[in-house]
């Protein structure tokens, strides 16, 4: 069985996507470079002040974290992977093992801002689901059931793998591998989608038309995103492609499923890591980062739905390939 398709279509699409993907790559590279400038620089060493405990994360760092989280959370490029990359450049990262654990927890908790943004954008769908729970909206009930089914695999597997993933996969090499592999998967899924649209196929499904098997399949696809650099959004959108959802509907199901999954992940991480976070991070920067994440996520979500309807995933394939190559070079040259 051939798992990796020919890369010839990538070469054909190069003229279409190269300029856009390279511009996005340069933009995020600019954020990475400037993130260090946004952080508070320590002054000259002063023996008298070393004994005074200072906040572990500055407001400048919080803004950078929030912006990167909001922009990348719902794009198929891995927000966690980007946040880990950014955190490696932050001064607060080099303040001991406990601070590193606090930052790793904050990288998950900051998703609360992005969650709120999507909840506001899809408030009608959420209201329909609520009415469905009350037995007043059959359409909303079917959608809610599908989302719960898709959430179950991550809910059952996630808590058991959380510590193992953080200890083994929160690094440059695992992120680079996941970015590269994800690019190949997206290219294959997009090529398959185009062939299906050009040929004879069954009508594409609506969100309410998903059955138990399709919803569960998307849920298991989401579990692969526990590996940083993979992207929860990418795996669920690709899963939607494979069960017959059109591009925009696959993205919308990914966003709605993300509301449940990200809320659970942020809540779980907040409860289990609250002590280390509260003792190392001030509330001001934490809340500021969440607000920035919410504002940038709102723009990102609206843009992505429109873009996918017109262009598909091609630009993100190129972005992930370029970024993975850069990270590989950084890792093996250090």
Indicate residue ranges for each PLM-predicted region:
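Multi-pass membrane proteins that catalyze or facilitate reactions on polyprenyl-/lipid-phosphate substrates
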Residues: 2-334
């Amino acid at each position: 069985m051939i798992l990796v398709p020919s890369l010839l279509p990538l070469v054909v699409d190069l003229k279409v996507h190269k300029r856009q993907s390279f511009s996005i790559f340069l933009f995020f590279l600019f954020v990475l470079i400037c993130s260090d400038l946004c952080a508070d620089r320590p002054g000259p060493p002063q023996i008298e002040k070393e004994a005074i405990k200072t906040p572990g994360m500055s407001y400048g760092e919080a803004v950078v974290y929030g912006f990167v989280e909001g922009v990348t959370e719902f794009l198929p490029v891995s927000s966690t992977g980007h946040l880990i990359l950014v955190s490696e450049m932050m001064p607060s990262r080099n303040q001991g093992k406990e601070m590193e654990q606090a930052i790793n927890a904050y990288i998950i908790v900051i998703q609360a801002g992005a969650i709120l943004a999507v909840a506001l954008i899809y408030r009608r769908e959420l209201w329909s689901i609520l009415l469905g729970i009350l037995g007043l909206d059959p359409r909303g009930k079917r959608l809610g059931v599908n989302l719960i089914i898709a959430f179950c695999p991550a809910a059952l597997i996630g808590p058991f793998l959380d510590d193992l993933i953080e200890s083994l996969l929160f690094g440059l090499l695992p992120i680079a591998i996941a970015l590269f592999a994800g690019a190949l998967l997206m290219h294959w899924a997009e090529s398959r989608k185009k062939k299906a649209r050009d040929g004879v196929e069954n009508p594409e499904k609506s969100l309410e038309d998903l059955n138990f098997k399709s919803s569960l399949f998307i849920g298991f696809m989401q579990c692969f995103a526990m590996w940083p650099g993979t992207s929860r959004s990418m795996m669920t959108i690709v899963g939607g492609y494979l069960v017959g959802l059109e591009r925009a509907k696959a993205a919308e199901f990914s966003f709605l499923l993300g509301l449940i999954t990200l809320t659970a992940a942020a809540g779980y991480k907040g409860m289990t890591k609250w002590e280390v976070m509260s003792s190392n991070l001030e509330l001001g920067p934490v809340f500021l980062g969440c607000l920035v994440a919410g504002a940038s996520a709102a723009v990102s979500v609206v843009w992505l739905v429109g873009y996918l309807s017109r262009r598909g995933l091609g630009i993100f394939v190129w972005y992930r390939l370029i970024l993975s190559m850069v990270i590989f070079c950084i890792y093996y040259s250090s």
